[in-house]
Amino acid sequence: MEKVQFSVQINAPVHLVWTTMLEDASYREWTSAFQEGSYFDGSWTMHGVLRFLAPDATGAPSGLIGRVVEKRTDEFVSVEYIGQVVDGVDDTESERARSLIGMRENYSFSEENGVTTVTVDQDTSGEMAAMLEDAWPKSLAALKELAED
């Protein structure tokens, strides 16, 4: 397992950045760099299950399943992956799904003098690392634009 880290400084209060990152409508906008049509289904509450989805080539929802394992509003949220969604069906048993179990995606937020720093720390495997290296900087730039607008 590899770890990747990305960060951005945003000229906006931390609560605004937190809300922009995690609310449904704005989430759909800033995550489009990962895949057009990206969205989540579920809840960012402690122990909430989230499905991070986008339409696959046939239009069926596909993506990752995670559980919120730590949350401090306006400071930190950690999602641990527990499987994947393939063709609209939850999969926690295939080899690919099992390889995801236990990987984490963490968002840290800190504010100083009206500038919020968002840091993303994510576990990954070799096959996903290149995609993350490409998509996260674009997504964080979109988040910055949304929060500063």
Feature-to-residue mapping (PLM):
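Short, solvent-exposed aromatic-acidic interface loops
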Residues: 82-87, 121-127
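Short coil-to-beta transition motif at edge beta-strands of beta-rich domains
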Residues: 44-52
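Intrinsic-disorder/low-complexity, polar/charged segments enriched in Ser/Thr/Lys/Arg/Asp/Glu/Gln
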Residues: 3-9, 14, 49, 63, ...
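A conserved amphipathic terminal alpha-helix motif
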Residues: 98-101, 117, 123-149
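Hydrophobic pocket/interface hotspot
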Residues: 17-21, 27, 50, 68, ...
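Hydrophobic ligand-binding cavity/cleft-lining segments
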Residues: 1-38
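Hydrophobic-ligand binding "helix-grip"
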Residues: 41-43, 58-113
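Generic detector of contiguous secondary-structure segments
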Residues: 6-13, 29-31, 54-75, 130-132
